[in-house]
């Protein structure tokens, strides 16, 4: 998405800033010791930016915002955006972080509802090839299993880098395609407890993508149940394409006019008149809940990045179209039954 180059340019500027200023801390070279670009308020917590080396060639970028309350005792939350291939810095700077880009992108404003009010939050850019995460050999081909393994290694490396957090309560969180990543990751954590103890307390996923067949099918039913699709189109899909019952209909195998009708229903959520994340919320002419106008602002900072052109090509908030071939979506159910007793608190 072109509009995300706004944020990309900001993070490149942030990277340059980090290169020159972050390492001034004598206690931790990853600590951010100077004021962030565009920040318009005073911080009352420590924050960090650095890398977690998970193999000889792979380095995952992370940012940590310490709890404002009691970082020694408050929970540690790991956050992952979805995609697959979306940078978790989107979560940091546009959703739940302590500093958010304002509407026109001119400054970073304080978020009164930041998750780090009562928890230390770790934003990990995963898999390698997303954001500032990289592989020295250029091999960032991945799939769901590789991503889960890499995320587990990253979390273990985090606790080795920050052993003071090892006894804190831990929560694994994310959104969207994290519905695939995180149950797999949590399963690895549970199975690895005997070798690497993590004080896991919970898993939370917003708007999760859990199972392709179920998610796609439920979208059709949701659209009809909320009056998004007209009766004639619905009856056509139901009777002519799904043998009278949409529940259990294998939508992916539909062809011809049936496939076109299903696509038409899905497109009803992206026609610019409906907010796909909350149909009761007005989003004007925007096709989704967020306004991306602010992302254009950082294109005006390009003159400060002339010597970082190479990095600019590598840094990505989303895996772009030319890179999708590197990410294999397994698209099955990711839920491991062994997680049930863990999530039930047993």
Description of each model-found segment:
Residues 2-346:
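Terminal and linker regions of secretory-pathway proteins
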């Amino acid at each position: 998405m072109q509009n995300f180059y706004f944020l990309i340019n900001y993070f490149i500027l942030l990277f340059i800033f980090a290169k020159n200023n972050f390492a001034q801390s004598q206690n931790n070279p990853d600590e951010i010791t100077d004021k962030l670009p565009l920040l318009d308020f005073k911080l009352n917590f420590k924050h960090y930016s650095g890398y977690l080396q998970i193999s000889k060639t792979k380095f995952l970028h992370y940012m940590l915002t310490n709890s404002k309350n009691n970082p020694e005792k408050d929970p540690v939350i790991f956050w992952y955006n979805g995609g697959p291939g979306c940078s978790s810095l989107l979560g940091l700077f546009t959703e739940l972080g302590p500093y958010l880009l304002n509407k026109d992108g001119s400054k970073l404003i304080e978020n009164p509802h930041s998750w780090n009010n009562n928890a230390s939050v770790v934003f990990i850019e995963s898999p390698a090839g997303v954001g500032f995460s990289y592989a020295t050999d250029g091999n960032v081909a991945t799939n769901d299993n590789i991503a889960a393994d890499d995320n587990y290694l990253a979390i273990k490396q985090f606790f080795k880098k920050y052993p003071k957090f090892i006894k804190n309560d831990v929560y694994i969180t994310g959104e969207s395609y994290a519905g695939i990543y995180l149950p797999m990751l949590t399963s690895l954590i549970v199975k690895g407890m005997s070798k690497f103890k993590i004080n896991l307390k919970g898993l939370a996923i917003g708007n999760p993508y859990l199972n392709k067949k179920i998610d796609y099918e439920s979208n059709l039913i949701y659209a009809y149940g909320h009056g998004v699709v007209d009766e004639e189109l619905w009856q056509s899909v139901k009777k002519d394409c799904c043998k009278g019952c949409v529940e259990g209909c294998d939508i992916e195998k539909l062809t011809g006019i049936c496939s076109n009708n299903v696509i038409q229903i899905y497109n009803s959520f992206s026609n610019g008149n409906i907010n796909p994340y909350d149909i009761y919320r007005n989003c004007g002419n925007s096709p989704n809940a967020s306004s991306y106008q602010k992302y254009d602002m950082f294109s005006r900072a390009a003159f400060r990045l002339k010597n970082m052109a190479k990095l600019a090509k590598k840094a990505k908030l989303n895996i772009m179209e030319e890179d999708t071939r590197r990410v294999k979506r397994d698209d099955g159910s990711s839920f491991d039954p062994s997680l049930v007793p863990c999530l039930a608190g047993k």
